[in-house]
């Protein structure tokens, strides 16, 4: 029992950090702006929010924050559309953006201090089963060949605002900071119901990327914390009481209701959660839960996840967000690939003395296919082609130089080939290269007021060189592996291109 209670207190901060006064320091906002320019993701310059930083406006904001009626108008008039009741749209948007960015920097400080305060003599435990995004594809190729069932989970995130704040109370015990977080969430929810409107969620995510990422990661880590607990302690859970692994102080009443609605849930059904071969992979808003167990086991996990989201996070999630499929008869979309584990027939000729016979065996192979329809839809949305895949010109780029136009098209083409180099079939990639190359030719011909054929004849091989460099780099990722017993002598294996963090939109065009 003490072991379970200690495990459930893992994320609770033992020291109380008062981070709210940092919002009155000018260097916090300068640091937030510098992080946006030099962070891991390119800054999307859409409006004045991300491309301008005024030290004078930040000083004015700090001066106004010292005033007593700073939040009165926004709190007492929740139906107004602009922060701080500013008539000037620029000031309203600038203050809202810079304040949310500074707040996102501040609330991350307790997490950093907790990691830095770890004593040096106490070694941080290393989890060998936790891997980075770079190793996901080799992991799937190595492990999924031996599994039977897969649950494709779309992680729900429109949760209740107050529950989201309460999840952070275990890590951030600074009450003014939590009230400020409530203000931001209520400010954006008043646009049109943050709970039910996907448009409001999109606007909040677009204008407050860092804060949205922090809140979303906090929510996901909370549910993964219990998922990992169940996975590691499933053999001991039937011996414990039904409330030890889900109990929280402010959720005790919820747990009592949970016990009334589902008596003996933890004591009885958790016996079916015991599975030594279960693997969990998550990227963005999707997750994969694969195992070698039975279909009945996967249904139990699905039932548990739905009930867990309903009674712990206090919102209902649709059962259709969790799809259970058999790996041998279906494919799943993950990280921009359509992956499957089909059984391929293999004929082996066996010679024994004077008798020879054929042995028909079936082997599993992790197969990855580039989805043509989503990628063509992405290129169509970016105005490189029509919805049916017919290449068109890019009029907005005709003001650029010829070299810049070639460089942009070539970079997109190389990114596609680099990321999807692990695909077992390259036909879709060659089709995408044809679309981009002809779109580039049409764009240059439109700029010089010429036809595509005339322009191609005048430009010659220099135009094609930019679009063939990616094949050389892809082929350089292939290596020859000589096997000891091989009928063909040698064969090639797929090498996944790992530099995929910077390719934002092309990583998963479905999002």
Curated annotation (Swiss-Prot):
Similarity comment text for this entry: Belongs to the intron maturase 2 family. MatK subfamily.
Pfam families (alphabetical): Intron_maturas2 (PF01348), MatK_N (PF01824)
GO cellular component, one term: chloroplast
One Gene Ontology biological process: RNA splicing
Listed InterPro entries: Domain_X (IPR024937), Maturase_MatK (IPR002866), Maturase_MatK_N (IPR024942)
Organism: Psathyrostachys juncea (Russian wildrye)
Location of the protein in the cell: Plastid, Chloroplast
Full protein name: Maturase K
């Amino acid at each position: 029992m003490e072991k379970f209670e200690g495990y459930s207190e893992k994320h609770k901060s033992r020291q109380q950090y008062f981070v709210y006064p940092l919002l009155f320091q000018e260097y916090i906002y300068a640091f937030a702006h510098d992080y946006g320019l030099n962070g891991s993701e390119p800054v999307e310059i859409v409006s004045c929010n991300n491309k301008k930083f005024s030290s004078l406006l930040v000083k004015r904001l700090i001066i106004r924050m010292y005033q007593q009626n700073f939040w009165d108008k926004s709190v007492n008039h929740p139906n107004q559309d602009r922060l701080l009741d500013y008539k000037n749209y620029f000031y309203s948007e600038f203050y809202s953006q810079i304040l949310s960015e500074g707040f996102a920097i501040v609330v991350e400080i307790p997490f950093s201090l907790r990691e830095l305060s770890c004593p040096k003599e106490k070694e941080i435990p290393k989890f060998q089963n936790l891997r980075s995004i770079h190793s996901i594809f080799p992991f799937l190729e190595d492990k999924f060949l031996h599994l039977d069932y897969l649950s494709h989970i779309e992680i729900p995130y429109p949760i209740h605002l107050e529950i989201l704040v309460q999840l952070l109370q275990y890590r951030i015990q600074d009450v003014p900071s939590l009230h400020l977080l409530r203000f931001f969430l209520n400010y954006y929810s008043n646009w049109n119901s943050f709970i039910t409107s996907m448009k409001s969620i999109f606007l909040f995510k677009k204008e407050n990327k860092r804060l949205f990422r922090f809140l979303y990661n906090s929510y996901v880590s909370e549910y993964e914390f219990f998922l990992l607990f169940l996975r590691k302690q499933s053999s001991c859970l039937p011996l414990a009481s039904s409330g030890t692994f889900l109990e929280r102080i402010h959720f005790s009443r919820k747990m009592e209701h949970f016990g009334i609605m589902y008596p003996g849930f933890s004591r009885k059904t958790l016996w079916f959660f015991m599975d030594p071969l279960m693997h969990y992979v998550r990227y963005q808003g999707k997750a994969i839960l694969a195992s070698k167990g039975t279909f009945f086991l996967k249904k139990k996990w699905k039932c548990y996840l739905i009930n867990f989201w309903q009674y712990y996070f206090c919102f209902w999630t649709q059962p259709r967000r969790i799809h259970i499929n058999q790996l041998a008869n279906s494919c799943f979309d993950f990280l921009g690939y359509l992956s499957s584990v089909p059984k391929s027939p293999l004929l082996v000729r066996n010679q024994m003395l004077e008798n020879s016979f054929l042995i028909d065996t079936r082997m599993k192979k992790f197969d990855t296919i580039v989805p043509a329809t989503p990628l063509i839809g992405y290129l169509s949305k970016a105005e490189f082609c029509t919805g049916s895949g017919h290449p068109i010109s890019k009029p907005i780029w005709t003001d650029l130089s010829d070299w810049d136009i070639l460089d942009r098209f070539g970079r997109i083409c190389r990114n596609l080939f680099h990321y999807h180099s692990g695909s077992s079939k390259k036909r879709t990639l060659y089709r995408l290269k044809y679309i981009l190359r002809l779109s580039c030719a049409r764009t240059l011909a439109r700029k010089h007021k010429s036809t595509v054929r005339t322009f191609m004849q005048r430009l010659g091989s220099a135009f094609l060189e930019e679009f063939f460099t990616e094949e050389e780099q892809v082929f350089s990722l292939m290596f020859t592996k000589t096997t000891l017993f091989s009928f063909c002598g040698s064969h090639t294996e797929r090498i996944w291109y790992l530099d995929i963090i910077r390719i934002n939109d092309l990583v998963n065009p479905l999002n």
